[in-house]
């Protein structure tokens, strides 16, 4: 029942992964506007009727600055979702779709205007275990190197989620104060992909 008490809720249980990924791709958020609420006020948990005291439904708009925007929809109100991309990124010269979920990645698709087709990048480690982040942490401690996702990044995501709740309460945008150094990723070559037929 603690899941539906203060400290729990959809933003902190589910949304945290989406915010962490989007901030990893696009950098720190500057401002948040959100609608956050409780659609299902009571739930049966462990055979008992439980009052839901936290959010179970949220739509969050993120302003990354420089006219770069994102949105996250999350909630315990979504019964099942299809095989649509988990994360979509749209830019001036193309688009990218993350396939699968953060915890079960299936690679990604990339559209580049110059290639004029979708390119599929298969998951590089399809047997990647969910707990492998712990191995990464241990490797970084042994090598005295920083982790890919830094503590500042996690703190920033926490501030974004709290700001989403505040924005919904106040009915206005909320500025974000924290910052973090954006992660650096290797550049992928088209040779690492295979082309897909685009029926459109």
Residue ranges of each PLM-predicted region?
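Predominantly a Rossmann-like dinucleotide-binding segment in NAD(P)-dependent oxidoreductases
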Residues: 1-51, 171
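Structural signal for well-ordered, non-membrane alpha-helices
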Residues: 23, 30-33, 97, 138, ...
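Short beta-turn/strand-loop junction motif enriched in small, turn-promoting residues
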Residues: 19, 75-77, 163
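A general structural signal for well-ordered alpha-helical segments in protein cores
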Residues: 18-19, 105, 131-135, 161
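Active-site rim elements
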Residues: 7-10, 121-125, 143-151
């Amino acid at each position: 029942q603690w899941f539906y008490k203060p400290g729990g809720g959809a933003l902190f249980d589910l949304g945290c992964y989406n915010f962490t990924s989007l901030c990893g791709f696009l950098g720190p958020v500057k401002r948040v506007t959100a609608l956050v609420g409780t659609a299902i006020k009571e739930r049966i948990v462990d055979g008992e009727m439980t009052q839901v005291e936290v959010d179970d439904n949220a739509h969050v708009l993120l302003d990354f600055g420089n006219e770069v925007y994102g949105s996250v929809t999350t909630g315990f109100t979504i019964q099942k979702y299809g095989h649509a991309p988990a994360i979509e990124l749209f830019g001036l010269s193309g688009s990218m779709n993350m396939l699968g979920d953060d915890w079960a990645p299936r690679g990604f698709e990339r559209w580049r205007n110059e290639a004029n087709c979708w390119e599929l990048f298969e998951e590089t480690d399809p047997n990647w275990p969910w707990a492998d982040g712990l191995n990464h942490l241990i490797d970084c401690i042994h090598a005295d190197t920083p982790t890919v996702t830094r503590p500042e990044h996690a703190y920033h995501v926490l501030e974004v989620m709290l700001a989403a709740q505040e924005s919904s309460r106040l009915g206005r945008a909320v500025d974000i104060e924290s910052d973090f150094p954006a992660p650096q990723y290797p550049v992928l070559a088209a040779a690492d992909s295979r082309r897909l037929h685009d029926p459109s």
